[in-house]
Design a protein with these regions (language model features):
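Long, charge-dense tracts
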Residues: 2-14
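Extended effector regions of multi-domain proteins
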Residues: 1-4, 18-263, 269, 273-460
């Protein structure tokens, strides 16, 4: 959606060529040979028009030229010279894994090291965690990746339309890989399969879409008594619940991590192949990098939104943030070295930022349950890495549609059916139906049933 001809559902398609010198190789890397034409297709699969792509330094469309031979750029192992100086690394658990998996309906209950939670799987979100508990205590009612947006940097027509919602437009579940032992997952693995519906409503088997395994997490804690020289040290083992999806050229490795200290993390790793477009040889542009002769990989952002429906010892939770500030010089602070921390309650729904200069950290609290040592409310702290918010301006359709992409944190009051940060229907959406719009209701979220959306991302 870009505000032009949006009343009719159409597809802007980009074309690539399989290497003519190796045309029998079905897995040839066609992203190394983008073509300078782009058909626009109607919903009944008719070609409406063919756009000619700009391949120079500006938006000018040059004259089409006959195809000239280009070098291949293959990724398959049989086309690579492999290293021979690496010794085997084996992950062996002679007594098997320490977790248990129990089937319950279409879901699986996993138990490991005081953790207990249910894993579900659906077409849009892929893996979903329910009823996450630690040592019998409730932590989270539901956790899932809500959506992601990938806006591209090239401002020229038709590349300005490249801003996919990989979950809303496609689906993390339906695009999940059939995971294999050895590279996708290591160790003593338990695989979880699923059955989804295809585009005609028929059952569609999805084998091995989730792998569950343990891994070493490095040193968990250590202290050496320098007086005696004696060290106490423990390793940190982690439970990993992982899925991998393929969305056209990109792969995403998505994993929930649980450790023995009660910490819970969500990780996304981007891999696969960059989305490419043609460029005249010898040309450079500021919105991309030439990665192969005549091939441009455009800069782009990946902005993810993790939906956290908390239940920290119950559903009456609040969101607060702590900051550290220097004390002014005074009789109490004559040397100017003191500083304090203060806590602020987030009272209404809205979008909020992490201020790293003030060491601002957000926490989800339950003031009805107190720490037995210091009397403070029990809480889970949110550790989110810094990332650059969406660079499309506020009047652009990219910004209007990706309602989660402008803030590190969104907090809203829970309402049934509000699951997707970019809105329920993202294909050619206009905005106004996602988490920014829900937050604008300015509802009270103190000691209430709230939902927190945590954003993170990369720009490359």
């Amino acid at each position: 959606a870009d505000g032009v001809n949006d009343d009719e559902r159409m597809w802007q398609t980009f074309l690539y060529l399989r290497d003519p010198a190796n045309s029998s190789e079905l897995d040839s890397n066609h992203y190394a040979m983008p073509l300078p034409i782009s058909p626009v297709i109607s919903q009944d699969l008719k070609v409406i028009r063919i756009d000619y792509l700009p391949t120079g330094k500006d938006a000018t469309v040059g004259e089409l030229k006959p195809w000239t031979s280009k070098p291949a750029n293959e990724y398959l192992s049989e086309y690579q010279k492999l290293r021979t100086d690496l010794k085997p690394l084996q992950v062996v658990q002679p007594e098997g894994a320490s977790f248990t998996v129990t089937e319950q309906g279409t879901s699986q209950i996993i138990q490991w090291q005081k953790w207990r939670f249910t894993v579900g799987f659906n077409q849009r979100e892929g893996m979903v965690l329910y009823n996450v508990r630690y040592d019998g205590r409730s932590l989270f009612h539901r956790v899932s990746l809500s959506d992601m947006n990938i806006p591209y940097a090239d401002p020229r027509h038709p590349f300005h339309k490249k801003a996919a919602f990989d979950l809303g437009d496609v689906g993390a579940g339906i695009m999940a890989n059939d995971l294999k032992l050895g590279c996708d997952c290591l160790g003593s693995i338990h695989y979880i399969s699923s059955v989804l519906a295809d585009d005609k409503g028929n059952p569609y088997d999805m084998p091995n879409v989730i792998c569950v395994h343990e891994q070493d997490g490095g040193i968990g804690w250590k202290h050496t008594n320098y007086r005696t020289g004696r060290a106490a040290v423990v390793r940190n083992r982690e439970l990993v619940v992982q899925s991998i999806i393929t969305v056209a050229n990109y792969e995403y490795i998505m994993a929930y991590h649980f450790n023995q200290a009660g910490e819970f993390a969500y990780e996304v790793r981007a891999t696969g192949i960059l989305s490419t477009q043609p460029i005249d040889e010898g040309i450079e542009v500021p919105w991309g990098t030439v990665v192969h002769p005549g091939v441009l990989a455009t800069h782009h952002q990946h902005i993810f939104s993790l939906r956290v429906d908390p239940a920290i010892d119950g559903h009456q939770n609040r969101l607060v943030y702590d900051e550290a500030h220097a004390l002014p010089r005074s009789d109490l602070n004559p040397h100017g070295t003191g500083y304090t921390t203060n806590e602020t309650i987030v009272e209404t729904s809205g979008g909020y930022e992490i201020d790293y200069a003030a060491n601002r950290t957000f926490k989800i609290q339950n003031v009805g349950v107190r720490n037995p040592i210091n009397g403070k409310p029990v809480a889970y702290k949110i550790h989110a890495p810094p990332f650059q918010k969406i660079l499309s301006d506020n009047d652009s359709f990219n910004y209007k549609r990706a309602e989660f992409a402008d803030k590190s944190i969104y907090a809203v009051k829970h309402r049934d059916g509000e699951l997707y940060a970019g809105g329920k229907y993202t294909n050619q959406s206009r905005g106004g139906e996602g988490v920014r719009s829900w937050a604008d209701r300015k509802e009270n979220i103190v000691d209430n049933d709230l939902v927190v959306y945590v954003q993170f991302g990369i720009n490359h």
